[in-house]
Amino acid sequence: QGRPPHPPIPPAP
């Protein structure tokens, strides 16, 4: 907890 939400990780090619 206490962490900002991270952006979605795109799938690797």
Curated annotation (Swiss-Prot):
Disulfide bond is among the record's keywords: no
Compartment annotation: Secreted
GO molecular function: peptidase inhibitor activity; toxin activity
Protein name: Bradykinin-potentiating peptide 13c
Sequence positions bearing Pyrrolidone carboxylic acid: 1
Predominant cellular place of this UniProt entry's protein: secreted
Record key words, sorted: Hypotensive agent, Metalloenzyme inhibitor, Metalloprotease inhibitor, Protease inhibitor, Pyrrolidone carboxylic acid, Secreted, Toxin
Function, as annotated: This peptide both inhibits the activity of the angiotensin-converting enzyme (ACE) and enhances the action of bradykinin by inhibiting the peptidases that inactivate it. It acts as an indirect hypotensive agent.
UniProt record similarity statement: Belongs to the bradykinin-potentiating peptide family.
A Gene Ontology biological process term: regulation of blood pressure
Gene Ontology terms: cellular component: extracellular region
Tissue expression profile of the protein: Expressed by the venom gland.
Superkingdom of the organism of origin: Eukaryota
